[in-house]
Regions:
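Boundary/entry segment of secreted carbohydrate-active catalytic domains
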Residues: 1-49, 53
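Aromatic-lined substrate-binding rim segments of carbohydrate-active enzymes
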Residues: 34-93, 106-109, 163, 167
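The substrate-binding groove and active-site-proximal loops of carbohydrate-active enzymes
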Residues: 56-67, 96-107, 136-149
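An active-site-proximal structural segment forming one wall of the substrate-binding cleft
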Residues: 67-85, 102-131, 150-162
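Catalytic-core regions of glycoside hydrolase
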Residues: 129-288
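Catalytic cores of secreted or luminal carbohydrate-active enzymes
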Residues: 266-330
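Structural beta-strand segments of beta-rich domains
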Residues: 336-340
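Short solvent-exposed strand-capping/beta-turn motif centered on an Asx-Ser/Thr pair
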Residues: 345-348
Length: 348
């Protein structure tokens, strides 16, 4: 039998739009208050995916208190209860002041990673990705005291050693990923899922389609054989790198700044090449509204033709498995065994 694809939104886990919620750990709060906050946040979040930002600025130059760790535990417990899939980001800044709010030395960041790891690992079935290195403005690894590739590598390796291998890690740019792993070769099917740092290190991008450079993600100079491993390539080079890498690890973030690169046809082409699987549902509204007010026009037989650009992108984030054909081979005279043949395509 030949089947036709539906155009409806599928409730597949670990993909789609997400909603952001942020909480500041503080000894002025009790774990019960943090639990109540998270219950409210989860209840107001219509999406299975949640970007949970945990601000550690109150502990920049001290250990995280037991009370604060208990708050984190209660928050993640509520996420489990609400059946959320959590993209987790620890940070020290929400106000563009990371240079002054980050810890004064690298060992303190490593200490914080060690402290949070047991709680995070307890909820490894709920935490999908741990984004970033705790550093930079809004945890985006920029304008940081720890932006050197050797410092970034140390933090990621600390996360790799402490955080459950069931949880993906993520860095901001392909260049950073290459510099951390000391290789220009993207992850292959042979090494995918083998438990190594290379197999779990993914990307997040909070400047998706914001400019030709995705707001600092790419550069205008082609990579050379003698380029530093963490050097940024051109847009076309980095899109190809992501196309290869992100068949096996997640890639997502938020779109920003209304411009030609996020016009619908351009957006569909580049989001597809990047294998984008998750996007912020609230930012940038100018871009999201542009998609909502545009119409996708596919081929005459395309079931999505005529839907809004937003709906097309929403239904294609991440994977979308479609059964294309099925048949049964059964000969009762010859055997009691039947063979079922199914052809499945991923149209995401």
């Amino acid at each position: 039998a030949i089947t036709e694809e539906s155009s409806r939104e599928l409730d597949n886990p670990y993909r789609g739009f997400y909603q952001l919620s942020g909480y500041i750990l503080s000894d002025n709060q009790k774990p019960e208050k943090s639990a109540a906050w998270c219950r409210k946040s989860c209840a107001s979040n219509p999406y299975p995916l949640m970007l949970l930002e945990i601000n550690l600025k109150n502990y920049s130059n001290t250990s995280i208190s037991t009370n604060a760790q208990n708050q984190l535990d209660k928050i993640l417990e509520e996420c489990v209860r609400a059946k959320k899939q959590v993209i987790l980001r620890f940070l020290y800044d929400w106000d563009g002041q990371a240079l002054s709010t980050e810890p004064s030395d690298l060992p303190q960041i490593k200490n914080h990673i060690s402290q949070i790891s047991s709680t995070v690992n307890k909820y490894a079935d709920c935490v999908y990705i741990l984004q970033g290195t705790l550093t930079g403005n809004n945890g985006e690894m920029n304008h940081s005291n720890y932006g050197d590739i050797n410092q970034i590598r140390q933090i990621i390796e600390e996360l790799d050693q402490n955080i459950s291998s069931d949880i993906f890690l993520a860095v901001r740019t392909p260049g950073q990923l290459r510099g951390i792993l000391r290789t220009r070769t993207p992850l292959s099917s042979t090494d995918a899922g083998n438990g190594s740092l290379q197999a779990r290190l993914s990307l997040f991008n909070d400047g998706i389609l914001g400019s030709v450079y995705d707001l600092g993600t790419y550069d205008d100079t082609p990579l050379q054989p003698d380029s530093n491993l963490d050097e940024q390539g051109t847009r076309s080079e980095e899109l190809l790198f992501q196309y290869k890498l992100c068949q096996y690890v997640p890639n997502g973030g938020e779109v920003t700044v209304d411009n030609e690169y996020n016009d619908l046809n351009n957006a569909i082409a580049d989001l597809s090449q990047m294998h984008i699987s998750y996007l912020n549902s609230e930012h940038d509204t100018a871009v999201l509204d542009k998609w909502k007010n545009s119409t996708y026009t596919g081929s005459r037989t395309d079931v999505f033709s005529g839907c809004t650009g937003y709906d097309y992108i929403s239904t294609h984030l991440g994977y979308r498995y479609v059964m294309k054909e099925s048949s049964v081979d059964f000969h009762s005279v010859l055997s009691n065994t039947a063979s079922l043949y199914i052809t499945i395509a991923n149209t995401g």
